[in-house]
């Protein structure tokens, strides 16, 4: 029974190894929430044990504050240490609104509260904040003081309606930007959640919105993000870009499919004079594509945009747009990261317009005359210096925009394929942040990818020989105790910190923790983390301005042979030899766990002084990610096993195991609970002398016996009663006699 139980446990262990050892790339280092806290590179904040739906809505590096919205609370956290006592404002929905919300059948816990969804900088002293208000949106001004030292954080004005500024439903995302004390929002404007709009409010000018109930403009959108992006050198040509996904009817007009989109408008758009009054006259949109083309032709689309990050440069046209996409298919679960050049996006918006033609309303490129100024052009910009407002636009320009808001060409990622693809994993990506890092051998982009399981993956983008780029997962961190989806993520390159939120709270994580890779130069070099380098003593933070000659870093190739000469590399590559015993016809496991799952493992066997030969794998001998399983040990398995790990052409011996095979009968007798070995204090009861027993076994077998005796002595020291003399000596006596005769045959003459 004991042997059967062991077999079952080994089987479960192997199954778990097989599940973990999928074809998907794995992180070099995985840290649980508690392990991450032990590194002292993270902080955590939560108001209570309740789920309050935290959202990081604004980061102010000048005042060293992080502004967080949650259910009934507005929080101001210290950007250097979020676990310090926060400044907070309790801002619940009115009792009447909460009761009305419940009467309407809304969720009392996750709907009938004031979920803060908008926090924008209004001026030097005030923030503008909006909440769902128990399905009755409300906004107000919050005084934060001129300096962070003022410790001022309070609402000092009356609340006003948030309609057109914040969605009624807290589970429907609201996106916003503030420009010159004007709020641009993407949200749903009604209680029922049927009227979506991109809205300009909080303005001394007239309020402007998208054309109402016009599916050509917006069709059941789910807003993701919004950004102000320059377009040329003239500030009047800047655009507000809205990223969203929407349900569009296919050509058969029978089903709706989800597509990711980008829309843009001019901030100085005041609407049309006779048509599109108080509606955008510069609204255009284009489809955002993230797909993988199979070898046989068809495309697998990642249709649902989840998050966007803009990696800005000194030249706005070279800005990169990173997007997280997921599949809308119910067949498989997948995520992808696609990267776009801003210049490619702007080229599509300057390209042909889409036009529906024919009985099937097929989309084609519009071939008619394009009115002047080109639809989508901002008034007062480089191309329209004489037009002060959009009310000066000719009627044909406004009419064209109303009927042709969609661009014909779609926006494709760099190299027309995703940078990262994950299919068949137990997680999906939800959020992204990107940092640009200067290393010894170049500049690298490091991606921080939040998942729906409460982890953050740190991924470095590596150049390859082809036109595409490779990627390597450096770390995966559990930033929350429970596996809850990550809702927002902000990065501060200045502070070298990442800020992450979920339903449960907010976490702060350093962008690097170099010491976790290991204590040797080779470990540090193989990690290929652009934040880290070997300084001659440890793996530590790399500073490009440093002039220390002992700094060792090779992100591009990760080759310790060229970087770690003189740092005890030879000793590092050899492992100490250990002895392990196995029992004939039983199972055994030779453990060999490489420091990195990115290393490949090969087993070599050396018998006596013969050359090492690679272990042949079969149904009896199985290699796993954690070691070598021998399902039925044979005498031929005895020898010295070498576990060789290879990573980036660098080989090292992870384990040396001198494996010795024991006789099953001897082990059964020695380990039997009724064995005479348990009667160490009752020698007189034995029908033969103990020396006869000791002489019956080989040196290696005696090592096992000595260990058994040691365990017995420890039991006696703990005060346990010695077991009574019982058992059958016949089997033991026969074994002793056979061993005696064998030992006499093999005994060397005394010298």
Swiss-Prot record:
Gene inactivation effect: Perinatal lethality. Mice display severe defects in cardiovascular development, including aortic arch malformations and septation defects in the cardiac outflow tract.
PANTHER family to which the protein is assigned, alphabetical: SEMAPHORIN (PTHR11036), SEMAPHORIN-3C (PTHR11036:SF25)
Protein name, per record: Semaphorin-3C
Source superkingdom: Eukaryota
Keyword set includes Nucleus: no
Keyword annotations of the record: Developmental protein, Differentiation, Disulfide bond, Glycoprotein, Immunoglobulin domain, Neurogenesis, Secreted, Signal
Entry GO terms, CC: collagen-containing extracellular matrix; extracellular space
Molecular function, one GO term: semaphorin receptor binding
CDD domains: Ig_Sema3, Sema_3C
Glycosylation sites: 81, 123, 252, 268, 465, 585-586
